[in-house]
Amino acid sequence: MSTTTEILAHHWAFALFLIIAIGLCVFMLTGGFLLGGRAKGRAKNVPYESGIDSVGSARLRLSAKFYLVAMFFVIFDVEALYLYAWAVSIKESGWIGFIEATIFILVLLAGLIYLVRVGALDWTPVRSKRQVVKSDIINTTNTHPQ
């Protein structure tokens, strides 16, 4: 028996799964294309607001802070996954594994401290912080005792 037939014999279920998944995707895309309605005209690009005429632009500018928080979450979530894998195999890793995990946690802590110091986790912009500090200074210097 050759190696290609052995590979096919062992992986026929995966190949069948791939064929069915790709076929289902093609079927759904062509079905939507053939059965879907086609609107032509200016009203096609106007959003439908439950019968209410839309007012203003639907494009909102979101702060990049949402993106940063999502990235920090993914990074720390993957690191938590590594710690979970270490915790599962703690008996096999012994003291060397404990020391490595401690170093790993200290590196994570250093990264978190760096993010806090840089201000990556602050939601208020630096401009508004300066305005708050200046307004507090102005309010304290302009107060007249009565």
From Swiss-Prot:
A Pfam entry, by short name: Oxidored_q4
Keywords on record: Cell inner membrane, Cell membrane, Membrane, NAD, Quinone, Translocase, Transmembrane, Transmembrane helix, Transport, Ubiquinone
Location(s) in or outside the cell: Cell inner membrane
Assembly description: NDH-1 is composed of 13 different subunits. Subunits NuoA, H, J, K, L, M, N constitute the membrane sector of the complex.
Source domain of life: Bacteria
Keyword Ribonucleoprotein recorded: no
Record EC number: 7.1.1.-
Encoding gene (name): nuoA
GO cellular component, one term: NADH dehydrogenase complex
Main location: membrane
Alphabetical list of InterPro entries matching this protein: NAD(P)H_OxRDtase_bac/plastid, NADH_UbQ/plastoQ_OxRdtase_su3, NDAH_ubi_oxred_su3_sf
Transport keyword on record: yes
Protein name, entry field: NADH-quinone oxidoreductase subunit A
Top-level class of the enzyme under EC nomenclature: translocase
HAMAP family: NDH1_NuoA
Membrane topology: Multi-pass membrane protein
Function according to Swiss-Prot or TrEMBL: NDH-1 shuttles electrons from NADH, via FMN and iron-sulfur (Fe-S) centers, to quinones in the respiratory chain. The immediate electron acceptor for the enzyme in this species is believed to be ubiquinone. Couples the redox reaction to proton translocation (for every two electrons transferred, four hydrogen ions are translocated across the cytoplasmic membrane), and thus conserves the redox energy in a proton gradient.
Family membership noted in the UniProt record: Belongs to the complex I subunit 3 family.
Catalytic activity field: a quinone + NADH + 5 H(+)(in) = a quinol + NAD(+) + 4 H(+)(out)
PANTHER family: NADH-QUINONE OXIDOREDUCTASE SUBUNIT A, NADH-UBIQUINONE OXIDOREDUCTASE CHAIN 3
Transmembrane parts of this sequence: 14-34, 68-88, 96-116
